[in-house]
Amino acid sequence: MPLEDAQNVTAARKELNKLVQERDENRLRPVGLSPLFQDYAQVYLDRLSTSGKKSDTVVTERTHVNRWSKAVGHLRIAKLRPHHITGHLHGLRKAQKSARTCNLSLTVLRNILKSARIDGHLKTSPAEGLEWFKTEKKAHRLYSPDEIDRLCKAALARRYVEGRLAKAGEKGARLKNGVQFVDYLRFLQYCGAREQEALRVRVADVDMERGHVMIGAEGDSKNREARAVDLNSQLRQLLEDMAKRRAPDSQWLFPSPQRGEKDEAAKTFRESLKLAREAAELPDFGFHDLRRFFASRAVMSGIDFLCVSRWLGHKDGGILLGKSYAHLANEHRKTQAARLIFSPVILQTDKASNS
């Protein structure tokens, strides 16, 4: 085993003593050349495709692995140092990437290095001890029913030309998938499903007789468990209306408009959302805001946290709901505050009322 830092006899003895200590502690460094990072990254990607992780997770990890390969792919994996890692992460920040994106990138790198350590290419990870980027916890805005209606109305308006808003004097047209897009918005609004969960719902997952829709019936929800969302009156009406116009050749509740002969679910409605929210002047509106809307309205309706958390797919009995989703509208808080009574009151009994 080479004595890497030995420039003289004293340094050689010091390095030798260090190696003896590492041997005694069973943490000797691997002998021989480690693979280039870019080569090992490909090994990791090959394993990732058969890891059982959800497709969305695989796509995200692949993006970050490719970024790391471009940044440090020329280095042998055992030569990767903390300054290489922090240099790339700070480069992402300079490129206006969010702190969350940088933290996700670091998580993916740690996954790669953990795999390399298991394979014997590393004894310790150079990413150990690196600090996470601090993320700002912003208060989420609660959109009103009128604002959601405005978004849906904008999605069906004749205001679009070649993937953008029509300019003054231009003749606009509707979004090609406008009706389906609005159905999707309403579905999220009335059942609280996550963006990707809703896209994977099949027609067979809707049980009108039993009065529920299954989210993640194939184990493809966020927590990999199926859950039943009971039909409220608006969700039932929406699903009945959708059934009248659904594509007879597709098993999906939201089939892809470009599926051709292959039956595929729609992959995303994000481009439609960008256009509709611009037209509705709701620039920060996101699909997850509809999940927050559902949770908040359910809580304001007096439904207990445990029931709502089950509809949302939480497994903590409502703790996260209380922290993250119970955003009560201003008028509701004021109404509840008006009901507070601090002075003594005389309650009328049934006997007194009948006399």
What is each stretch, according to the model?
Residues 1-86:
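N-terminal DNA-binding module of tyrosine recombinases/phage integrases
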Residues 8, 142, 215-221, 312-342:
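Catalytic-site neighborhood detector that most strongly recognizes the C-terminal catalytic loop/helix
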Residues 80, 179-182, 283-301:
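Short basic/aromatic active-site micro-motif
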Residues 102-105, 118, 122-123, 128-195, ...:
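Basic, Lys/Arg- and aromatic-enriched nucleic-acid-binding interface segment
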Residues 118, 186-197, 291-315, 331:
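C-terminal catalytic core of tyrosine-transesterase DNA break-rejoin enzymes
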Residues 153-174, 210, 235, 241-248, ...:
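C-terminal secondary-structure termini that scaffold catalytic or DNA-interacting sites
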Residues 205-212, 284, 303-324, 334, ...:
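Short, polar N-cap/turn motifs at the start of nucleic acid-interacting alpha helices
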Residues 220-241, 250-274, 286:
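C-terminal catalytic core of Y-nucleophile DNA break-rejoin enzymes
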